């Protein structure tokens, strides 16, 4: 069994489970006598190698990847930690040729036989292009709280993010009930509503708005939100929970980074209008306090759930197995309850096409069982 030199990096937004992947790769590789080099801060690490900031030995990961003092020495905690011990950056495609050349030079200096890339759709697109230029052998591992990477049912980090948002909705329910408030929660999801939909159902939301069904907040959708809230009021509920994805646009079809606040204002104004011209029942909504909150980067943090640790671990192990078999340019995926792998090229083609057309590469299925589940519960999803 020959020694191999492989690299591993994390790229794009962080999420729970990244360190569990790193741990699995390092431990499995160590048992084979391989050397694993941790590239700091995505492809920027290659630039720093090219510029002499790091030598190869500086990046060599040990069996545990870190050192702990005293009685903690040898304690294996990496799988429990959120974030990335390697660091991560979201910078887009290298715009200057000199930067791309430095990345390729840094990779060549390290003399790697393969590179494991833990990233989302954007990162995989960028690094695939670099790999083609540099003739790299790469294995991709999908990670994203958006769960929008094609071909895989789940990406590392998604399950924990759903749990974090669900817990937030649970906690907010009680303050909403105590003060008879309508609380609108803004959830991450640039183009995809998987996180918002899953957490909204699990967290007991009354209205869930995602870009696949509600690309923009039309006046009709806002009125329907008011009707949903009025019906809750008539049933005896004096509070409500609305979850909206950051990917939903405003009434002018413009992206609004404060879309929850925007929706709160629109519901207030529309309720007043309906009260004045149509039905006095809407006047009851006006008395309700409407508050908006954005969970932000809390969704990327937190201790990974056991399932995300398991998913990250089996993904890391499969990546090492593929390198051992010299099966390159693959993406490790989770499909129908088991780990598999697929050619990376067609996935990148889908990602590129969708990015050019401003579409999500793996959107929520409007006719899927999760959407049907929400509708069966009486949750309003923003249909006109």
UniProtKB/Swiss-Prot annotation:
Reaction(s) the record says it catalyses: beta-D-fructose 6-phosphate + ATP = beta-D-fructose 1,6-bisphosphate + ADP + H(+)
Site (Important for substrate specificity): 122
Gene that this polypeptide is encoded by: pfkA2
Protein name: ATP-dependent 6-phosphofructokinase 2
Cofactor: Mg(2+)
Sequence similarity: Belongs to the phosphofructokinase type A (PFKA) family. Mixed-substrate PFK group III subfamily.
Pathway the protein acts in: Carbohydrate degradation; glycolysis; D-glyceraldehyde 3-phosphate and glycerone phosphate from D-glucose: step 3/4
PROSITE patterns: PHOSPHOFRUCTOKINASE
UniProt-listed GO biological process terms: fructose 6-phosphate metabolic process
Binding residues for ATP: 13, 91-92, 120-123
Keyword flag Endoplasmic reticulum: no
GO cellular component, one term: cytoplasm
Catalytic site: 146 (proton acceptor)
Gene3D superfamilies: 3.40.50.450, Phosphofructokinase domain
Record-linked HAMAP family: Phosphofructokinase_III (MF_01976)
Binding site for substrate: 144-146, 181, 188-190, 246, 291, 297-300
